């Protein structure tokens, strides 16, 4: 390996379309709220796929969004996704410290895809293998209620996987696995990477990489098996291959199948995760 520290990441990279000031307790929003786990309705703090939300409500997504937002345009458009955002932060913090941060992924060749590509080009992250495909760019509509939970605030997420379906393990080249640190971020929204995570982690460890996994709400598995714990890769062998696991409390509950924070942490320890961060905003 070179003297420079190389960090390579793959995972969720998308466009966030933020709508502020959405009242989660309003009569307008009430018909769209979830009634049971995985049903496709909205839940504060959680993510649902736009297609599932359409099925749940029985209306096209654009019509639903107009009803929820009053037909207004989004307040802000941003680079989003737990993989690329954390990598950008790391690159900004280490830019002058002999560290190079790289990203692998796929976007769509559409208007917001061009926005995303241009915006990423303004960051210190090196786009090692980021290409635009004929699929639509991954995006998340973010509904924000700053008054929710006694003023602590909360968000709800409506995601479209889009071109993230085109991101596959074979696109991760030797340079990826020759990195000092590899980061798999929010891969539940990049299905082919997520479903092969055990083998990818195994390959990374065999090449001497320090492995980091940071999670995101896994609606795909929540929908498929709402009563079962979420898989991370092919099987639980993934955990012993992770040097640092970063998850929030709700995701920790779903991944472990436990309903208590201490029990969830015990599960990860028993699975031989080397180190672990579980966030619990705003009560952390």
List the predicted regions and their residue ranges.
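Active-site-proximal loop->helix
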Residues: 110-123, 142-148
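Conserved phosphate-binding/catalytic loop of the ribokinase/pfkB sugar-kinase fold
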Residues: 106, 130-132, 140-191
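Anion (oxyanion) recognition and catalysis
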Residues: 91, 95, 121, 202-206, ...
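Glycine-rich phosphate/adenosyl-contacting loop at the front of the ribokinase-like
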Residues: 2-102, 111, 115
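A glycine-rich helix N-cap at a beta->alpha junction
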Residues: 119-135
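Structural beta-sheet core signal
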Residues: 9, 103-105, 143, 213, ...
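Hydrophobic beta-strand scaffold residues
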Residues: 101, 127, 211-213
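Conserved beta-alpha-beta core of the PfkB/ribokinase-like small-molecule kinase fold
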Residues: 181-267, 274-275, 280-284
């Amino acid at each position: 390996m070179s003297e420079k520290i190389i960090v390579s990441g793959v995972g969720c990279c998308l466009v966030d379309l933020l709508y502020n000031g959405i009242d989660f307790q309003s009569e307008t929003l009430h018909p769209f709220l979830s009634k049971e786990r995985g049903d496709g309705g909205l839940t504060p703090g959680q993510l649902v796929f736009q297609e599932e939300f359409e099925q749940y409500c029985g209306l096209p997504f654009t019509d639903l969004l107009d009803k929820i937002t009053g037909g207004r345009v989004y307040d802000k458009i941003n680079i989003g996704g737990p993989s690329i955002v954390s990598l950008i932060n790391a690159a900004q913090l280490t830019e002058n410290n002999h560290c190079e941060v790289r990203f692998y992924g796929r976007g769509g060749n559409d208007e917001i895809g061009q926005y995303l590509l241009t915006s990423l080009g303004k960051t210190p992250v090196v786009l090692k293998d980021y290409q635009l495909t004929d699929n639509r760019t991954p995006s998340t509509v973010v509904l924000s209620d700053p008054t929710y939970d006694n003023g602590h605030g909360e968000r709800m997420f409506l995601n479209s996987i889009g071109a993230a379906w085109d991101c596959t393990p074979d696109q991760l080249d030797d340079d990826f696995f020759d990195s000092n640190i590899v980061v798999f971020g929010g891969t539940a929204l990049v299905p082919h990477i997520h479903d092969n995570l055990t083998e990818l982690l195994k390959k990374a460890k065999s090449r001497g990489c320090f492995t980091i996994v940071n999670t995101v709400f896994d609606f795909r598995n929540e929908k498929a098996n709402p009563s079962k714990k979420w898989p991370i890769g092919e099987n639980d062998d993934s955990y012993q291959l992770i040097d640092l696991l970063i998850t929030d409390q709700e995701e920790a509950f779903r991944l472990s199948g436990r309903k208590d924070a201490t029990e969830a942490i015990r599960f990860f320890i028993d699975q031989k995760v080397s180190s672990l961060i579980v966030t619990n905003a705003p009560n952390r």
